[in-house]
């Protein structure tokens, strides 16, 4: 998915919010924004927005020396999600369609995206999860449901901290011995890393790998050889979040994208209303097995 002109204001906002996560110094905020605006003037608009996000956060790290400005927010949302897990699991267990409800909850958890809304509160996230209990799924859910039992090698690409606890509810309904969970290789925004997978208890359930990258998405050319090997071997890939949709939507692979369409550009690209919960099969599904 290419960057559009409507992406530019969001990129600038994200850069400023990230700078404010690191420091209260207006001079540093201005320094970073001036540099980012100069980069944006020269950027290749055919690239997905996460390419730019990666550059922004590398520059933020270079200027401030702070490796993980979102660590405190990630801890807060992990704690919130952990508290919600028991009653959500109980709802799933009592449901007439546990797999469907688990998927809906996992996708609703994609609201915990501080790249889209750096001011997201725990209360807002909690309300979103409650609303998901009745919100419909748009797109290709029934197709995904039919493919899960046949899959021999499932790759589940996580998106954000906090959200990864809700991913667990869906992963618990998959054939665990066939599942590999992938997280980011290094901190970027509030994206999930190995530490978040460990906090959610997923390392004790399934194989966990990282992609070796610090991009807020999955840029295969920037990922580790091991991750790319696992990606190519998978016959079913569940890719969570908008960043993974932006970076993988042109890849020929058996991918289902699971995300909340928080951004109007992505909602239009996916053919859904903003705020919708989406399951979308790749237009280039590639070969299985």
Where are these regions (language model features)?
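Histidine-anchored nucleotide/phosphate-binding helix
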Residues: 160-180
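Electropositive, gly/pro-rich neighborhoods at or near active sites that engage anionic ligands
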Residues: 1-151
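Alpha-helix C-terminal capping segments
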Residues: 148, 171-175, 231, 248
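Structural motif
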Residues: 153-155, 235-236
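Alpha-helix N-cap/loop-to-helix initiation residues
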Residues: 4, 156, 163-164
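C-terminal functional extensions of proteins
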Residues: 183-189, 193-198, 202-289
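Residues at the starts of beta-strands that form the adenosine-phosphate
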Residues: 152-153, 177-180, 254
């Amino acid at each position: 998915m290419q960057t559009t002109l409507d992406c530019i204001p969001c990129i600038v906002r994200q850069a400023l919010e990230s700078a404010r996560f690191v420091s209260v110094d207006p001079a540093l905020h201005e320094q970073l924004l001036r540099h980012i605006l100069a980069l944006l003037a020269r950027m290749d608009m055919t690239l997905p927005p996460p390419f730019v996000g990666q550059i922004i956060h590398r520059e933020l790290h270079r200027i401030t020396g702070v490796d993980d400005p979102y660590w405190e927010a990630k801890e807060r949302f992990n704690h919130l999600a952990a508290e919600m897990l028991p009653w959500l699991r109980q709802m799933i267990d009592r449901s007439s369609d546990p797999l469907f409800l688990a998927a809906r909850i996992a996708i609703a958890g994609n609201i915990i995206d501080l790249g889209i809304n750096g001011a997201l509160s725990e209360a807002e996230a909690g309300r979103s999860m409650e609303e998901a209990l009745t919100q419909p799924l748009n797109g290709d859910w029934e197709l995904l449901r039919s493919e899960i039992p046949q899959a021999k090698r499932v790759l589940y690409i996580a998106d954000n901290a906090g959200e990864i606890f809700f991913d667990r509810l869906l992963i618990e309904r998959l054939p665990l011995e066939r599942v590999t969970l992938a997280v980011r290789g290094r901190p970027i925004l509030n994206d999930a890393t190995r530490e978040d997978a460990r906090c959610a208890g997923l390392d004790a359930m399934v194989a966990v790998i990282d992609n070796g990258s610090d991009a807020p998405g999955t840029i295969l050319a920037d990922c580790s050889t091991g991750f790319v090997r696992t990606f190519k071997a998978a016959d079913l890939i569940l890719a969570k979040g908008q960043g993974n949709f932006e970076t993988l939507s042109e890849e020929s692979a058996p991918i289902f994208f699971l995300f909340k369409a928080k951004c109007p550009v992505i909602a239009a690209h996916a053919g859904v209303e903003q705020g919708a919960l989406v399951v979308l099969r790749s237009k280039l599904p590639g070969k299985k097995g």
